[in-house]
């Protein structure tokens, strides 16, 4: 039995990665191979706590947990509570699975990995007038596929390095600017530090945070028939 929390199989391959980067026919072929094995599938079935997993272990010979890392890293309460700020995975999920194509005019993406690139390029395709991605490290530290940065630039997106988000600037309870700080890498220990008196602001009405994720929960007991596979 396979429990899937979304309305379709495929995980982040299907719900997260944009169609322009991974054609759905490839995923559909793999799903067909799985379903042809006679596996029982329950869609829209969420297993959302360690207690639920432990309960399943009493009803099945073995439980394999392959839920990924979906809990987004956050900056602070100002960012997490602002309705104009959303995390990258939620953004991709609502676009790819829920068909919700809302996008701001001046979009800022924070991050330097696959998700950040996917969010920036998706925002451009949705019609954003301006898309700027900010990464606190240097270009050589990007964790992306070869050619992705060039594709973003060719699509009229921008990538700005050595800058990190600092403060949201609102006007009449509406997001108007993001204040950032320029950064540098210390030579001795490669630590990222702020550059003194280097704050600057960028106009924005929509911020997408793609700064990594972590596991939502894990089993608290050592149970012999529970296995973790990703």
Task: Describe every region a protein language model picked out.
Residues 7, 26, 76-90:
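Non-heme iron-sulfur electron-transfer modules
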Residues 83-88, 154, 176-184, 217-230:
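Flexible glycine/proline-rich, aromatic-decorated loop/lid segments
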Residues 2, 6-37, 120-167:
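Rossmann-like dinucleotide-binding cores of NAD(P)H-dependent redox enzymes
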Residues 187-196:
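Intrinsically disordered, low-complexity Ser/Thr- and acidic-rich flexible linkers and loops
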Residues 1-3, 42-57, 71-73, 90-146, ...:
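Rossmann-like dinucleotide/flavin-binding elements
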Residues 17-22, 60-61, 81-83, 148-152, ...:
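Short, hinge-like loop/turn segments at secondary-structure boundaries
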Residues 28-77, 167-179, 206-208, 214-216:
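Feature captures the FAD/FMN-dependent oxidoreductase FAD-binding
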